[in-house]
Amino acid sequence: MYTRNIGLDVKLPESECNDPHCPYHGKLSVRGQVLTGKVVSANMTKSAVVAREYQQYIPKYERKATKIKKYHVHVPDCIKIKPGDTVRFAECRKLAKTISFVIVEKVNQ
């Protein structure tokens, strides 16, 4: 099967899939933000929860606080993930009520 170039500098998946919401083997286009995070939960069907940690400066206390933002992401069949993996995910059109990101690369092996 043909693997599309999605326009990002990421490693292509080795396996193939028939998922229509796959950016490589389906018709889903990615645009907008490209983020990196850690998989917290992969219990949903073809979906996962990815968390990103960032530091926010609080002027009143003159300190930085660590915040966590969770994203619901679509997992194509050609990318295998498990909780604890670091992944790169990109913004796409809305696929469900809370899912508007898709995993494009597994960063660590």
UniProtKB/Swiss-Prot annotation:
An annotated GO BP: translation
UniProt keyword annotations, A-Z: Ribonucleoprotein, Ribosomal protein, RNA-binding, rRNA-binding
Gene3D superfamilies (UniProt xref): 2.40.50.1000
GO molecular function list: rRNA binding; structural constituent of ribosome
Family: Belongs to the universal ribosomal protein uS17 family.
Quaternary organization: Part of the 30S ribosomal subunit.
Gene Ontology CC annotations of this record: cytosolic small ribosomal subunit
Function text: One of the primary rRNA binding proteins, it binds specifically to the 5'-end of 16S ribosomal RNA.
A Pfam family of this chain: Ribosomal_S17
Protein name: Small ribosomal subunit protein uS17
